[in-house]
From Swiss-Prot:
Similarity comment: Belongs to the complex I 20 kDa subunit family.
UniProt xrefs under HAMAP family: NDH1_NuoB
GO MF assignments: 4 iron, 4 sulfur cluster binding; iron ion binding; NADH dehydrogenase (ubiquinone) activity; quinone binding
Subunit-structure text: NDH is composed of at least 16 different subunits, 5 of which are encoded in the nucleus.
PANTHER family, per database record: NADH DEHYDROGENASE (PTHR11995), NADH DEHYDROGENASE [UBIQUINONE] IRON-SULFUR PROTEIN 7, MITOCHONDRIAL (PTHR11995:SF14)
Keyword terms, alphabetized: 4Fe-4S, Chloroplast, Iron, Iron-sulfur, Membrane, Metal-binding, NAD, NADP, Plastid, Plastoquinone, Quinone, Thylakoid, Translocase, Transport
Protein name (Swiss-Prot/TrEMBL): NAD(P)H-quinone oxidoreductase subunit K, chloroplastic
Listed NCBIfam families: nuoB_fam, PRK06411.1
Example of a GO cellular component annotation carried by this entry: chloroplast thylakoid membrane
Membrane topology label: Peripheral membrane protein
Ligand binding ([4Fe-4S] cluster): C43, C44, C108, C139
Gene behind the chain: ndhK
Gene Ontology BP annotations: aerobic respiration; electron transport coupled proton transport; photosynthesis, light reaction
């Protein structure tokens, strides 16, 4: 059997009692139950049609495509990501429960592809928006390469510790930002195209029932 199909064993007794850690057992249980969210935008996504057939047998890895990010733990991005689609992609990623993983499929997803030089509306790499676990280059990648990327992700899951993954994701860049709101009063100057000037009131002028 493959080494990634079983949790790491700490100790084995003569009575066939196996002891291991809770993290290893959790990682092992997730290996055969990855539920991907397929985020395809262009031609690379057509290669998934070959995986569904009997020749490559997409289901043998326990992959069940989901239409809701709240039921998925893997998002597979394939195709060009534009600036207008970036907030939607980040929102889908943030709605996925922990632990979650990302596979970037295709040259357009990884670097922007042929649109990376002179396009004003293309994201130069999906890793600028969400953290990526496995990069899958190609234009488009073959179905065998997709299976190899899934195998590499399964090996990564079998060796990782949940706490380490949580700390590493907090260090990655993210598209969303924390906004700070202040109460202010606008002063119109009467000139067209001129910005509003805001004056912060003193604390005595703020009502006691105001919430931030």
């Amino acid at each position: 059997m493959n080494s990634i199909e079983f949790p790491l064993l700490d100790q084995t007794t003569k009575n066939s009692v196996i002891s291991t850690t809770l993290n290893d057992l959790s990682n092992w249980s997730r290996l055969s139950s990855l539920w991907p969210l397929l985020y395809g935008t262009s031609c690379c996504f057509i290669e998934f049609a070959s995986l569904i057939g009997s020749r490559f047998d997409f289901d043998r890895y326990g992959l069940v495509p989901r239409s809701s990010p709240r039921q998925a733990d893997l998002i597979l991005t394939a195709g060009t990501v534009t600036m207008k689609m970036a907030p939607s992609l980040v929102r889908l990623y943030e709605q996925m429960p922990e632990p979650k993983y990302v596979i970037a499929m295709g040259a357009c997803t990884i670097t922007g592809g042929m649109f990376s030089t002179d396009s004003y509306s293309t994201v130069r790499g999906v890793d600028k928006l969400i953290p990526v676990d496995v990069y899958l280059p190609g234009c488009p990648p073959k179905p065998e390469a997709i299976i190899d990327a899934i195998t590499k992700l399964r090996k990564k899951i079998s060796r990782e510790i949940y706490e380490n993954q949580m700390s590493s994701q907090r260090e990655n860049r993210c598209f969303t930002t924390n906004h700070k709101f202040h109460i202010g009063y606008s002063t119109h100057t009467g000139n067209y195209g001129q910005e509003l000037f805001y004056q912060l009131p003193s604390t005595s002028e703020i009502p006691s029932d105001t919430f931030f």
